[in-house]
């Protein structure tokens, strides 16, 4: 299974091309069913022994991967969104400022989507500053549930880990770490 994983990492790396502003287009990665399937299997191998009752991501780009991971683990998916869903009465919400942008973002999740006894795996396609993932961790805490781990395809450096304030021994699994260009 390790050689398959090494193949996954090099496949992802080969598709990362930064533009002159230091951004990259991840469409090729998050839209590739083969990559998503391999990544979901990798998450399954890493988190199968852990208690996971929900997979949690933020809209939009993390959804394809989180869907595949939730399916592989046989658990439900919860998506934090930037807008309040019509028909939902109560929400948990978390507001944060996007680093270096001055833009404030609020993520909303239906209040009963994550229960007190849930053990939540946070999944995202990419972690850059960790702001979004920290907001997801805070939403899990507001629901009085526990974070069972973090899983991502790509992470830029490792500075972001400090922001998450994860409990001791909480696993963080990233397929490939890249340096900021």
Positions of PLM-derived features:
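Active-site-facing substrate-recognition patch
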Residues: 1-51
């Amino acid at each position: 299974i390790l050689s398959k994983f090494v193949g996954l990492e090099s496949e992802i790396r080969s598709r990362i091309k930064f533009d002159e502003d230091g951004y990259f287009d991840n469409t090729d990665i998050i839209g590739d069913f083969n990559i998503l399937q391999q990544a979901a299997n990798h998450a399954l191998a890493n988190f199968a022994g852990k208690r996971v009752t929900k997979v949690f991501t933020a809209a939009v780009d993390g959804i394809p991967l989180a869907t595949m991971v939730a399916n592989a683990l046989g658990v439900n998916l919860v998506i934090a969104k930037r807008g309040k869903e019509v028909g939902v009465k109560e929400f948990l919400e978390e507001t944060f400022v996007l680093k270096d942008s001055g833009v404030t973002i609020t993520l909303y999740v239906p209040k009963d989507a994550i229960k007190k006894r849930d053990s939540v795996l946070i999944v995202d396609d990419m972690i850059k500053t960790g702001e979004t993932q920290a907001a997801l961790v805070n939403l899990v805490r507001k629901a009085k549930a526990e974070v069972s781990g973090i899983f991502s395809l790509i992470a830029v450096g490792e500075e972001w880990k400090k922001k998450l304030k994860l409990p001791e021994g909480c696993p963080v699994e990233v397929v490939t770490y890249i340096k900021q260009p």
